[in-house]
Design a protein with these regions (language model features):
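Conserved ABC ATPase "signature" region
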Residues: 119-136, 387-405
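Catalytic Walker B motif of ABC-type/P-loop ATPase nucleotide-binding domains
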Residues: 165-169, 434-438
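Hydrophobic anchor residue at the start of the ABC signature
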Residues: 153-154, 423
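Conserved ABC ATPase signature
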Residues: 140-144, 148, 382-385, 409-413, ...
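ABC ATPase nucleotide-binding domain signature region
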Residues: 46-120, 315-379
Length: 490
């Protein structure tokens, strides 16, 4: 009889706030590698929490068989890592702008210190060799590239020798080369007889070839486990039908945005951004070296490059978040930095969303207040908007498909729903300059198409300027007019 590493039958959470729509019945068999897939807000994370025993059951049964593990507790044998962006999950000590402040980097621990003492020397050697950890040991954790950090996080988790490893969005924020590296590493891990891999994904493209089965989740309903090939075939057929159906509604959505009135009373300069021989260093590493770059009003830039090339650092200069900008020759909206302007005078022109902002913005306010904070560029809502401003906030939430969540606490939204709310926040003041750093992070196929259409319509309006970062070429809107590719300084 085949070993059932995990078995749940008729499972219903005791707490009604975390229940899925239907009772859950599901089996994970030894040798299977599973992908849990579904749209934003479908219930994927709730399913994982149920399977890992986080929520006690009101009805049903949940059992495990972790052989050959020496222990049989879920705590020892199931490890869960959720990746929200390039740099992992938010933590309580993280704050916006932390990456750009040198004194925070000085206090950051080394990789060696975080890995600690390893009791199983054979396992340590195997993992350090697989992930090439040795060259990273004396680096500060906050200065790791995204690929290095992903390898560190996996190594630290795997050193506990789990029987089941669950990873939520493991490929998020990675460039093509780093995604391929991670694919290859996971493929090697999948060959270990003692490890079962479960991936929680929102993008069909991220289902690797070593995955044997797929569990679909939609509207809180957990579907039947399917073989990978059968699921992909079914999904593509359904998606082709939906693309046709969405075309008309997306057209109407774009027209609503195109019909917005022209308002450009905040600045008159044709030059939006100018960098002259700008260099940025952290410790002994040069991030940007003598960079010249000019962005003119109405241009739409695609900013690209491998992980660690300095894209987010460059955007931090444009957004007035990086203290090193005062020592550089930088002009924003026609004014040279350091000539008396406040950061708020700069930010009032900018609508911005980024992984760093998402990590820092863990405020348990109603979602509409998160959107409203974009009117004043604050992390949190400290100035009460008037009724007209709140109506504008709700309008943009409707555009992004999350108006129905306006009163729901932000931290109770799924990661994808949070991203949509933060996108509405970036657009809410109808900014002259839109800065989108990986805006489609964690969004499902439908919402990625929807947001791309919104960006295209917004950028087609008079005098709108945009800078967008993405590692997926197919995410770029058709309105892109210029490109800047950054190479990593080795």
């Amino acid at each position: 009889m085949q070993q059932h590493t995990l078995h749940i039958a008729g499972g219903v959470a005791r707490n009604p706030l975390v229940r899925l729509s239907n009772p859950v019945t599901l089996d994970f068999l030894d040798g299977e590698h599973i992908a849990i897939v579904g749209p934003n807000g479908a219930g994927r994370s709730l399913l994982v929490d149920l399977l890992t025993g986080k929520y006690p059951l009101r009805d049903g049964v949940l059992t495990y068989d972790f052989r050959p593990s020496a222990t049989q507790t879920a705590y020892d044998n199931i490890k869960y890592i959720a990746f929200r962006d390039t740099y992992g999950s938010a933590d309580a000590n993280y704050y916006y702008q932390q990456r750009w402040n040198a004194h925070d980097q000085e206090d950051a621990p080394l990789v060696r210190e975080l890995l600690g003492e390893v009791k199983n020397e054979a396992l340590r050697q195997q993992l350090f060799g697989l992930f090439r950890i040795e060259p990273m040991l004396d680096k500060k954790i906050i200065l790791l590239s995204s690929g290095e950090l992903r390898k560190f996080q996996l190594t630290k988790t795997l050193l506990t020798a789990p029987r089941i490893l669950i990873m939520d969005n493991p490929f998020i924020g990675l460039d093509a080369a780093t995604r391929e590296l991670l694919f290859n590493v996971l493929e090697k891990l999948a060959q270990l007889a003692s490890l079962q891999i479960v991936l929680v994904l929102s993008m069909l493209d991220d289902v690797p070839s070593f995955i044997t089965h797929v569990v679909p989740v939609e509207n809180g309903v957990v579907g039947e486990k399917m073989e990978r090939a059968a699921y992909l075939r079914t999904f593509r057929e359904r998606d082709a039908i939906r693309v046709e159906a969405d075309a008309a509604s997306f057209g109407e959505l774009q027209q609503r945005i195109m019909d917005l009135p022209y308002e450009n009373t905040n600045f008159t300069s044709d030059e939006v951004v100018r960098l002259n021989k700008v260099s940025i260093r952290y410790d002994d590493r040069t991030i940007l070296k003598e960079l010249d770059w000019t962005v003119m009003r109405g241009q739409k830039w695609a900013l690209s490059g491998e992980n660690g090339a300095g894209k987010s650092t460059l955007l931090s200069l444009v957004c007035a978040d990086n203290p090193q900008s005062y020592a550089c020759d930088i002009s924003l909206f026609g004014r040279k930095r350091g000539t008396g302007e406040s950061i708020w005078e700069i930010k009032k022109h900018i609508g911005y969303v980024s992984p760093e902002m998402h990590r820092a913005y863990l405020k348990n306010l109603p979602a509409i207040e998160i959107v409203a904070s974009g009117l004043h560029d604050s992390i949190g809502l400290y100035k009460r908007p008037h009724a007209g401003q709140m109506a504008v906030c709700e309008w943009w939430m409707d555009v992004f498909g999350v108006a129905g969540l306006k009163d729901k606490p932000f931290l109770q939204l799924s990661s994808g729903e949070q991203r949509l709310a933060l996108l509405a926040r970036a657009f809410v003041k109808d900014p002259e300059l839109l800065i989108l750093d990986e805006p489609l992070h964690g969004l499902d196929t439908y919402n990625r198409r929807r947001v791309k259409k919104i960006i295209e319509a917004f950028c087609a309006r008079r005098d709108k300027t945009m800078i967008m970062v993405t590692h997926y070429e197919n995410e770029l809107p058709a309105t892109i007019s210029d490109r800047l590719y950054l190479k990593r300084n080795r």
